[in-house]
Amino acid sequence: MSRVSQARNLGKYFLLIDNMLVVLGFFVVFPLISIRFVDQMGWAALMVGIALGLRQFIQQGLGIFGGAIADRFGAKPMIVTGMLMRAAGFATMGIAHEPWLLWFSCFLSGLGGTLFDPPRSALVVKLIRPEQRGRFFSLLMMQDSAGAVTGALLGSWLLQYDFRLVCATGAVLFVLCAAFNAWLLPAWKLSTVKIPVREGMGRVMADKRFVTYVLTLAGYYMLAVQVMLMLPIMVNDIAGSPSAVKWMYAIEACLSLTLLYPIARWSEKRFRLEHRLMAGLLLMSLSMLPVGLVGNLQQLFTLICTFYIGSVIAEPARETLSASLADARARGSYMGFSRLGLAIGGAIGYIGGGWLFDMGKALQQPELPWMMLGVIGIMTFLALGWQFSHKRTPRGMLEPGA
């Protein structure tokens, strides 16, 4: 086996272990934020939505800067620093009793993510061969789902005792992850050439096709982020207990572990990437429309199942598509900018979703936020269809198996 092949194989295992620690640390804390501050402390959903939206926007909106700096200086220092900063954010969240302190903790958490997320994504593109990326992204998503339900279960159990224990556990996991990277991650460069920060960012901004694709995905993310805000609140309201939230993540884990990899393997040779992304988005959008009208957990979990199946179809295609469109000369910058759609869509989804949720309750129209989200998803579906029409997309780039 050549040294390059050996490095790729070892790199795969490193990425999987690193990803599991990050997912566990994140999901121990974040799914329970809305439960803690809205249901237990009585804050308005808008206040919590601002905090979650701020974290999302800081982490993803500034990702191009984190990616460009990583292109210049390498992945390791950025990843280690970012993970320690997120640990500090979680520790601060544990003592948050005023909205400003929650916002500050989410700001720290988001800034840490700005530093470690783009170089980690770029390492996947660097280490995984193009023909294997779709399946590897599926494996990462399966791991994400298993880690999410494990983290949510652990966090829900700890929440019975003290929210500070929840945050301390998340902080410790990110400190461990920082140590793991500091110890084992080689000083790899992310791009094929060492370019100045400004040049890497300039390459991305000049790629109009990539920029349009990323910005269009903002509507997709407005729906996706509700698994952290409105869906947990909805489950808690109907069930009358925050412990029911863990079953929502258990559903996601079961569907991902059983369906994600088989669907990715079956569809990658039969359908174009953009068609898989659009099909999943349409299913997610249609499942959102009736959520506000349900009256029991069985109906709600059925819609959540449909939403997750849509995500299982869409997510591997979205990740693979983003990676395939990236310029190898500025991988970090491209993968950082690819998070801008999540920054915009996530911030609007959290803040706008929280505001609409409060407004729907005040007007006694609980279906209002869900109808709006469904409409936004359908509009995004149509926008992607226009962008990926044959007149705009060169044939071959996004073909099955390309």
From Swiss-Prot:
One of its GO terms (molecular function) is transmembrane transporter activity. The gene is mdtH. Its main location: membrane. The keyword Plastid does not apply. Keywords: Cell inner membrane, Cell membrane, Membrane, Transmembrane, Transmembrane helix, Transport. CDD domains: MFS_MdtH_MDR_like. This is Multidrug resistance protein MdtH. The keyword Transmembrane helix applies. The chain crosses the membrane at residues 13-33, 45-65, 99-116, 139-159, 165-185, 214-234, 244-264, 277-297, 300-322, 340-360, 368-388.
